Amino acid sequence: MFDFSIVTQWVHSLLTSFMPEELAVLIECIVIGVCIMLAYAVIAIIMIFMERKVCAAFQCRLGPMRVGPQGTIQVFADVFKMLIKEIITIRHADKFLYNLAPYIVILASIMAFSCLPINKGMEVLDFNVGIFFLLAASSIGVVGILLAGWSSNNKYSLIGAMRSGAQMISYELSVGLSILTIVILTDTMQLSEIVERQADGWFLFKGHIPALIAFIIYLIAGNAEVNRGPFDLPEAESELTAGYHTEYSGMHFGLFYVAEFVNLFIIAAVATTIFLGGWMPLHIPGLDGFNAIMDYIPGFIWFFGKSFFVVWLLMWIKWTFPRLRIDQILTLEWKYLVPIGLCNLLLMVIIVVFKLHF
């Protein structure tokens, strides 16, 4: 498996050979920031196109086909259309909070996106408390959503924001419990270290029953946390028009839209990192030839392949199941997922203490 840190160390030594180290670090930070923004934009474009095609497939349609080959340039046309739209601020809105809210949501999404270990040595933010930072960064987005609903001075926006806040805060608990189950198994909160521990097998397969239960809980709770169907009640069109971003137009609406899709990718990428081995290839015990071939595939291809498979799975769920009511959503969380998650966590503790894991 290629270690990308060799490249970063070579670039750092090259820059420090003809400039002060402080200036070299500053240039590296700028380059990394630009790369993160470009990767964020590319992921958003792919996710939007994938959503439209997957939706069309489940509805027996073709989806975007007009602009570009097989509709591949349709997303760029939509972005251009959104860029030239006027940004309208409604009367009696709290203009400062109204304009600030989309940037808080997108900032939280970018911070969480920066934590993803795409390849060995290719982590931007790799702390020894990476899981803690990831959960903290992703939870900031609910502040922007609540501000968007409150500052819009619109009852539909406010109801959508309150629904979203209640839903996100509730399901954050189940997400944390499912991740904590694997943290107990690995005895580390560093994302890259969790991936390294899966070199001899993904936790979904070698973590016993608690890992499988935690994976299922994580998919359900993660889907609800990013307000995806069937948990998309905060923006239920039949009740609340567009929910908390009803009064937003132009690129302000575009920021909410992009953040929603990238947050879906982040949920899938974290599932890949924690349960599906991250950048680790698929190894089958006893098949050394097959395993050797799998090792030739670059780690980032494994990471993105697994992540987009989980994304497709979540999109499948969205376009298959009907929307739940708010009482059903909260009942599912507090009466079922949380108790099951706590019992599952206790079961994992017993397995680790008595060394019953593989």
Swiss-Prot record:
GO molecular function ontology, one term from the record: NADH dehydrogenase activity
EC number: 7.1.1.-
Main localization, broad class: membrane
Transmembrane stretches, start-end: 30-50, 96-116, 129-149, 165-185, 201-221, 264-284, 297-317, 336-356
Keyword Translocase appears in the UniProt entry: yes
Record text on subunit structure and interactions: NDH-1 is composed of 14 different subunits. Subunits NuoA, H, J, K, L, M, N constitute the membrane sector of the complex.
Entry protein name: NADH-quinone oxidoreductase subunit H
